[in-house]
């Protein structure tokens, strides 16, 4: 039989915030006695946009923007009830999106 596992996916535009958050999660899980695999960096999604600088003239003049979405994956193996309680209490930065699957 497979042991219970918590899979945590983190997404953010700022890689420093996502690295800090994943480090906090790892420290919390290890402190409560669970085993942690990760953080595993997943591929960064890059969206590029080109916008004309002017409305009517200078078609060749365009500005280019990009949005980078950084992702990390954490697996917590054999979590205890204390591990889950501590993860619920964890305060993460506003720019980090977290998805937890058990």
UniProtKB/Swiss-Prot annotation:
Pfam families: Ribosomal_S10 (PF00338). The keyword Ribosomal protein applies. Coiled coil: none annotated. PROSITE patterns: RIBOSOMAL_S10 (PS00361). Keywords: Ribonucleoprotein, Ribosomal protein. The keyword Ribonucleoprotein applies. It comes from the Bacteria. GO terms for molecular function: structural constituent of ribosome; tRNA binding. Involved in the binding of tRNA to the ribosomes. Belongs to the universal ribosomal protein uS10 family. NCBIfam families: PRK00596.1, rpsJ_bact. This is Small ribosomal subunit protein uS10.
């Amino acid at each position: 039989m497979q042991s219970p596992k918590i899979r945590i996916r983190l997404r953010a535009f700022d890689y420093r915030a996502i690295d800090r958050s994943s480090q906090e999660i790892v420290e919390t899980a290890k402190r409560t006695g669970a085993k942690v695999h990760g953080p595993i960096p997943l591929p960064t999604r890059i969206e590029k946009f080109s916008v004309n600088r002017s409305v009517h003239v200078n078609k060749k003049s365009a500005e280019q923007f990009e949005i980078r979405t950084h992702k990390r994956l954490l697996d917590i193996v054999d979590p205890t009830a204390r591990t889950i309680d501590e993860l619920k209490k964890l305060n993460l930065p506003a720019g980090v999106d977290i998805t937890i699957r058990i």
